[in-house]
């Protein structure tokens, strides 16, 4: 990528009294850049190029070419806040308005049949995205009791989003004009006494689709905004020797934007709306000082991440890859993609005089690449450990020399952390194409730090 930005900020703060202050920020960012790639055997119609007639009079529908895809954008706005800090009450209110204006366009820089280009640096698509994003909020935290406080946070957010022009997919026209109005409240109570702490909270959060949701949408797909209702409660206890904690959560979604397992042409992970889904689980944390020179800490997350009544949409082609129709399979309750049921971490830290060491391990359960809960489209569970050792020398001619050696993937686990998949029905058979992002085996890194 060849991309540059210029960022400008103007910030003003005013202290009105011991209790009140105000802040105002104006900002502007301009960016422009591109990436360039070679496409072998590209269809000329995908680049709005006329068919090439060779010397024998044959029509050539494909050519090798170099394309350059550009982004030129402006982002600017204003952010304001007023803050009150009293003995029992802390209060903030504010507003913001921001606008993003971005041009996406592509040029054919070179083609094997150069006389096929209507003009140098031929532009084959251009579209403009414009996003106006404004919000107002107020939040308060009140000390109800020396050991008890409550908080309330309310936000209104409005969005106007448009995309207009031709897309890079065979010049398809894109026309998006969407308005959203969101109300995002959050409330909770916190309790603290001695080494004990507990909380309960409820919040609502809304999220709009992004550009890819519109430009990469499937046939008859109409991206919607996501709404989350989040319920959480937790308890913890700690002292100078150990600490434990447990958090319970239930996240109820409407139209959740969920990873599909598919990727775009440039490798971006794609999402799509799922009407009814949830995530629920428990997060456990703990730690203990085993000795003055040794301590352990760890965490464990156990969860269920489910789609209710998932309907798989699958494209159907004939033997020559001509599109026939789109079928739908009702799969019932399935697992959400890339959402393992178990994640566990453990870390031992050792320190003795000038020597230190740490040993950490992580286990991640099975992750499904798409939302069908099909095992042959999944990432296997993996367990990985890393070891770090260090020693600090204190010579007379300088403050210190610190030497660290880290061995990653100590036991040479063969594993992947991400993947993509494309599946279709071709000539009556299930077709699958996938790719896995494999991770490095055992590897080491050494570092020397000098302090004067």
Question: Across the structure, where does each feature detected by a protein language model lie?
Answer:
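Outer-membrane beta-barrel channels and translocator barrels
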Residues: 17-19, 86-89, 145-149, 157, ...
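Transmembrane beta-strands of outer-membrane beta-barrel pores
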Residues: 28-32, 86, 97-101, 156-160, ...
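Gram-negative outer-membrane beta-barrel transporters
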Residues: 146, 250-252, 272-371
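Face-selective signature of the C-terminal outer-membrane beta-barrel domain
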Residues: 3-35, 39-168, 190-194, 198-201, ...
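Flexible, surface-exposed loop regions and adjacent strand-edge segments
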Residues: 1, 38-49, 104-117, 166-175, ...
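Membrane-embedded beta-barrel scaffold of Gram-negative outer-membrane proteins
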Residues: 19-27, 190-203, 207, 224-280, ...
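Conserved C-terminal beta-signal and adjacent last beta-strands/turns
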Residues: 140-141, 231, 286, 301-302, ...
């Amino acid at each position: 990528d060849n991309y540059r930005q210029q960022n400008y900020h103007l910030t003003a703060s005013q202290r009105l009294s011991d209790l009140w202050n105000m802040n105002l920020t104006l900002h502007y960012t301009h960016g422009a850049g591109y990436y360039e790639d070679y496409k072998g055997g590209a269809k000329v119609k995908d680049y709005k190029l006329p068919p090439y007639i060779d010397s024998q009079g044959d029509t050539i529908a494909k050519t090798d070419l170099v394309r350059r895809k550009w982004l030129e954008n402006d982002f600017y706005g204003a952010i304001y806040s007023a803050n009150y800090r009293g003995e029992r009450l802390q209060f903030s209110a504010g507003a913001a308005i921001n606008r993003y204006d971005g041009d996406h366009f592509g040029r054919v820089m070179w083609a094997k049949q150069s006389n096929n280009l209507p003009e140098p640096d031929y532009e084959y698509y251009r579209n403009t995205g414009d996003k106006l994003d404004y919000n107002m909020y107020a939040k308060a935290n009140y000390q109800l009791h020396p050991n008890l406080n409550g908080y309330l946070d309310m936000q209104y957010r409005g969005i106007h989003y448009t995309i207009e022009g031709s897309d890079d997919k065979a010049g398809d026209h894109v026309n998006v004009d969407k308005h959203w109005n969101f109300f995002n409240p959050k409330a909770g109570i916190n309790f603290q006494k001695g080494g004990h702490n507990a909380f309960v909270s409820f919040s609502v959060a809304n999220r709009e689709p992004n550009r890819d949701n519109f430009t990469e949408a499937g046939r008859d797909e109409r991206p919607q905004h996501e709404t989350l209702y989040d319920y959480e409660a937790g308890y913890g206890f700690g002292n100078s020797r150990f600490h434990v904690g447990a958090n319970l959560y239930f996240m109820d979604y409407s139209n959740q934007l969920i990873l599909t397992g598919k990727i775009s042409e440039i490798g971006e992970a794609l999402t799509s709306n799922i009407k009814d889904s949830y995530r629920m689980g428990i997060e456990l944390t703990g730690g203990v000082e085993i000795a003055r020179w040794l301590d352990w800490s760890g965490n464990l997350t156990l969860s269920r991440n489910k789609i209710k009544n998932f309907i798989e949409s699958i494209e159907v082609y004939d033997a020559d890859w001509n599109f026939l129709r789109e079928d739908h399979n009702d799969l019932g309750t399935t697992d959400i993609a890339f959402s393992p049921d178990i994640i566990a971490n453990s870390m031992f830290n050792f320190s003795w005089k000038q020597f230190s060491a740490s040993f950490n391990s992580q286990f991640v359960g099975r992750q499904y690449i798409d939302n069908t809960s099909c095992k042959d489209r999944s990432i296997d569970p993996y367990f990985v450990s890393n070891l770090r050792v260090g020693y600090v020398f204190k010579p007379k001619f300088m403050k210190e020399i610190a030497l660290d050696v880290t061995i990653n993937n100590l036991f040479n686990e063969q594993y992947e952390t991400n993947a993509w998949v494309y599946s279709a029905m071709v000539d009556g058979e299930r077709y699958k194409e996938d790719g896995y992002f494999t991770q490095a085996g055992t590897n080491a890194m050494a570092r020397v730090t000098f302090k004067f």
